[in-house]
């Protein structure tokens, strides 16, 4: 491993991302794995820079000269006087010839062009990729924090040094920029264009989920695992001793009629999404500064879906068909997901760079899985946002209702079992809460960081409706009688989880909307270099992810009504724990990168991640 060049606390000059300008910075730390330095600018901004974007102060001081020390206004004055000077006056040795004067004018013009490119101090945001809006292709950029492999163009050291005379923030005494006539602009642009460039090798982006081999196994393994779980659950004895279950022929799993019903369901939800009801809000800023608009009508879609389902039941529609063809519906959803993922990847190949996800890598297999385009839209129809809460989440509730009716029919019950009522009620509350607080989805990692590919498509359209309804599906074939005292304890556990989950999310969302709200004045915070504050009290001073803790408690509560005869009903809580621990690790990585020292202070104040005194 190469040794570091600069020590902690050393004062050097670092390149500002998106420009060729160097400013005085202090070395805070060095990551030996990524070979990146965390530096602090004079205004408090903390960034990660590569070693070749940092230079010692001595390399600049050696280039000092009289010509660079004069003020811009005086340079402009001397330039003006050189044109009006009498031709008969004998020039002094220090005076310039006409040719030298012209070259100096060009140099001055180039300097002024560089000043115009002085970067603004922008607040970073989660879905930033690598470029500022309107940045020229020929200016060298420092994109180390984003780790994107790209060609980088290099200006001369002289231009870089001149740029260091301008501070990070504009001051009153700084000279106003003056216009450059079109002839000089063309000359400068031409001269800059012919400069040679060098390709700087950048360390490959860290890939999640085990990289390309990992996502390849996930894409093929998850559908297989899903069908094995459903087949195991349908067995009379679903114990692990009877694994693997008997496998049906492939032709038995495919029915065109089932696929048609699934398409009809999807299109109905599209229709509800497009209805002009519900308020319109803006999402988080994109790389180019745009804020996409989203219509919040998920709860209205749920009400309309309930009306359609109720009317269908009243008209005598047989919903037992869904239960008897449950595996076929799972296969239809999987096929639809694969087709959608192929479409998403193909359209992303033509998407502008600013529309790509920061999680994309350039590898076709990995990008097909993680999603290459951040917010794929057809007009105003946002595919990712729609799939996150509509077909799968509302479909989960419909499947639970189907299982409740199937239990009554198969077990010849006049009313559903208490266990089935608990499972349906708990999960109905969870879905309604998500739809009612739909706006909170816009700040999640799924929306602001991950692209829309196979991972989210399969998770939203297949995994959620067919795995999250697993407890209800299990109770149809494996009834479990729950006593009222036991039911009371389970209800209390569920309510505790919901209070933690909703309280933490509501506190976070309220603080994001209005940090100066008097109702939140009692909360303690840590200020960050991005201008935002981190909550270190309330729910977020208890553990770093109290919403995850509440989520897991609720997941346990809706598994307990299934009893303890088999481990299958507890697959969800096991899987969900692994999912949230992994997601917490992803959150930790991105927050540490974004907030730097402030995040480390927060971790010291709040040492436990999800489970207090455990993890």
Curated annotation (Swiss-Prot):
Keywords: Acetylation, Cholesterol biosynthesis, Cholesterol metabolism, Cytoplasm, Disease variant, DNA-binding, Dwarfism, Endoplasmic reticulum, Lipid biosynthesis, Lipid metabolism, Membrane, Nucleus, Oxidoreductase, Phosphoprotein, Receptor, Steroid biosynthesis, Steroid metabolism, Sterol biosynthesis, Sterol metabolism, Transmembrane, Transmembrane helix. GO terms for biological process: cholesterol biosynthetic process; neutrophil differentiation; random inactivation of X chromosome. Residues 1-62 form the Tudor domain. It is an enzyme of class 1 (oxidoreductase). The modification Phosphoserine is found at residues 59, 67, 71, 86, 97, 99, 128. One of its GO terms (molecular function) is Delta14-sterol reductase activity. The modification Phosphothreonine is found at residues 58, 118, 200. Phosphorylated by CDK1 in mitosis when the inner nuclear membrane breaks down into vesicles that dissociate from the lamina and the chromatin. It is phosphorylated by different protein kinases in interphase when the membrane is associated with these structures. Phosphorylation of LBR and HP1 proteins may be responsible for some of the alterations in chromatin organization and nuclear structure which occur at various times during the cell cycle. Phosphorylated by SRPK1. In late anaphase LBR is dephosphorylated, probably by PP1 and/or PP2A, allowing reassociation with chromatin. Its EC number is 1.3.1.70. It catalyses: 5alpha-cholest-8,14-dien-3beta-ol + NADPH + H(+) = 5alpha-cholest-8-en-3beta-ol + NADP(+); 4,4-dimethyl-5alpha-cholesta-8,24-dien-3beta-ol + NADP(+) = 4,4-dimethyl-5alpha-cholesta-8,14,24-trien-3beta-ol + NADPH + H(+); 4,4-dimethyl-8,14-cholestadien-3beta-ol + NADPH + H(+) = 4,4-dimethyl-5alpha-cholest-8-en-3beta-ol + NADP(+). The chain crosses the membrane at residues 212-232, 258-278, 299-319, 326-346, 386-406, 447-467, 481-501, 561-581. Residues 73-86 have a biased composition (Basic residues). Residues 52-109 are annotated as: Disordered. One of its GO terms (cellular component) is nuclear lamina. SUPFAM superfamilies: Tudor/PWWP/MBT. It is a multi-pass membrane protein. Changing residue 586 to H: In SKPHA; uncertain significance. Catalyzes the reduction of the C14-unsaturated bond of lanosterol, as part of the metabolic pathway leading to cholesterol biosynthesis. Plays a critical role in myeloid cell cholesterol biosynthesis which is essential to both myeloid cell growth and functional maturation. Mediates the activation of NADPH oxidases, perhaps by maintaining critical levels of cholesterol required for membrane lipid raft formation during neutrophil differentiation. Anchors the lamina and the heterochromatin to the inner nuclear membrane. The Tudor domain may not recognize methylation marks, but rather bind unassembled free histone H3. Belongs to the ERG4/ERG24 family. This is Delta(14)-sterol reductase LBR. It comes from Homo sapiens. The lineage of its organism: Eukaryota, Metazoa, Chordata, Craniata, Vertebrata. The gene is LBR.
